[in-house]
Amino acid sequence: MEELVGLREGSSGKPVTLQELWGPCPRIRRGVRRGLEWLKERLFRVGEDWHFLVALGVLMALISYAMNFAIGRVVRAHKWLYREVGDGHLLRYLSWTVYPVALLSFSSGFSQSISPFSGGSGLPELKTMLSGVVLEDYLDIKNFGAKVVGLSCTLATGSTIFLGKVGPFVHLSVMISAYLGRVRAKTIGETENKAKEIEMLSAAAAVGVATVFAAPFSGVLFSIEVMSSHFSVWNYWRGFFAATCGAFMFRLLGVFNSEQETITSIYKTRFRVDVPFDLPEIFFFVALGFICGVLSCAYLFCQRTFLRFIKTNRYTSRLLATSKPSYAALVALVLASITYPPGVGRFMASRLSMAEHLHSLFDNNSWALMTRNSSPPWPAEPDPQNLWLEWCHPRFTIFGTLAFFLVMKFWMLILATTIPMPAGYFMPIFIIGAAIGRLLGEALSVAFPEGIVAGREVNPIMPGGYALAGAAAFSGAVTHTISTALLAFELTGQIVHALPVLMAVLAANAISQNCQPSFYDGTIMAKKLPYLPWIRGRQIGSYPVTVEHFMNCNLTTLAKDTPLEEVVKVVTSTEVSQYPLVETRESQTLVGIVERTHLVQALQTQPASWAPGQERFLQDILAGGCPTQPVTLQLSPETSLYQAHSLFERLTLQSLFVTSRGKAVGSVSWAELKKAISTLINPPAPK
């Protein structure tokens, strides 16, 4: 009992406790507590999802901007070092190469030592997790720290290594979302909800894209196209709300840091608005889409083939298994040596950063026409107001530098994707596509120097518009997405080329999707992740194939009248996570599901009231409190492969039991379903 020491001031008789009297500022504490309880009540009346999404967007914007700020300082220090070492070729070469070699080897070594799951972009693993597969290690907090440090070091190498930020940052956003979800569940006392978690992870994927490009609309659509096979419209508002908060905060930080006067697009363009293109140019935009589609197929095929070669080659596989930092340093040395500006790098604009590459390629002036009569000298240092001069070397024409840039970056990017470190691969593909479009645009500007005559109006061709279409088409073809067109508009703030850019993206996807799997699907296949392949039911005849053709008939059931000795034998001889519970051994009528963990626990804690020597059955264990689950969904042997595939994808299922007239006859898991789809798509050769 508390010791009472007096009455409250102004009270009619309610006593004051000793703890309350001597506590520090009891009235203030009570007021603060009441205020916090009132605020909590009002906030949760609105809905906790809103606060969760706002916190996620703001937090990811802060992380993205902080990373960009730190990376910018490191890149600036590298340029200063390269500029100040003098004219000696050896010192300049060492200052150019040692920097990325050290950063890349540290990125690979640090990230792999902290978490071996931090390498790559992380998007294939996220796509697998959003389909219902549990990959806990990829959402671990250690993985977050390794990914942040490793990605920062990778991006600090600049355009020398030529890698991006999108994929790993989406992975970081999903990890933050999972962590905040656990905190929220503990705060409000909510049990874990798998469906709710997947909804929040989908919104987090949109936030990751939006806080990299400050593009909320394309961020949501790109995350849907890349991550989801089926998407609920109910999740739309979550994705757009969180992405808008993140993009707004990201651009607002740039204004606060005096980087810009107001919130604008990242890559500003000066395209002609009144007549941006003539009607006959639509044909060339569509042709550009077909070219990007063909080149994307070549890139995807070469990338998968080279990755397979690196993994199977005796020397490279041994080096990757024993010393990943050494492999990263070796690849970085090769790439840095090629991009050394006084060497081959002078012919591929190697002194420009990746952002400056896009700024220059989106220039609306024709470089070929500007250098037709005279070749400007190659500047000693890049001019921020005339970045296009980096593409004009006295020994090469504009077409030569653009073509050389494409050829070199094509295989250099494939080589860089084999390094085991956190890195994104979307931005390099986007820039390569812009160079493809720029090359075609410059060729058309030379072929039609006065523009294509359409009626009485004559308008010069803008190669920057073709660069914009090429960037969207090539990146869309590699990733099998259409939203890259909208991303190009949000990045540049221009929508005057909306129709030709969209037509180019559609043409590129028409070729790529029919010839090659996307970059992320190819990575899923290379890593052998548990992901169901996509099927076209009506085209490959998945309806005639039924469950009875591929189900697992070796089903271990537990009947209620099974003696406990046999139950123990079944549990110890099998390793399945759950058993189908049937009524009797004769009828095999499916009545429920019993988890292995619950069954083992019940067997180990037999009631003391049981008489020794008396035979007991499974139904006695169940009556004693062993929990069972009802069978809410099951397959029929006549269910088609297409229907089973749709159920597994939309409901994120792992396995289902097959019943015929209530009798358990088999089961279907991911393994059987994936094998059936593979056999249907690639039938075995006749014997």
Swiss-Prot record:
The chain crosses the membrane at residues 52-72, 94-114, 161-181, 204-224, 236-256, 282-302, 325-345, 396-416, 417-437, 458-478, 486-506. One of its GO terms (biological process) is renal inner medulla development. Ca(2+) binds at residues 259, 261, 278, 281. The keyword tRNA processing does not apply. SMART domains: CBS (SM00116). Expressed predominantly in the kidney. Expressed strongly in the cortical thick ascending limb and the distal convoluted tubule, with minor expression in the S3 segment of the proximal tubule and the cortical collecting tubule. One of its GO terms (molecular function) is voltage-gated chloride channel activity. Keywords: Calcium, CBS domain, Cell membrane, Chloride, Chloride channel, Ion channel, Ion transport, Membrane, Metal-binding, Repeat, Transmembrane, Transmembrane helix, Transport. It comes from the Eukaryota. It catalyses: chloride(in) = chloride(out); bromide(in) = bromide(out); nitrate(in) = nitrate(out); iodide(out) = iodide(in). It is a multi-pass membrane protein. Homodimer. Interacts with BSND. Belongs to the chloride channel (TC 2.A.49) family. CLCNKA subfamily. This is Chloride channel protein ClC-Ka.
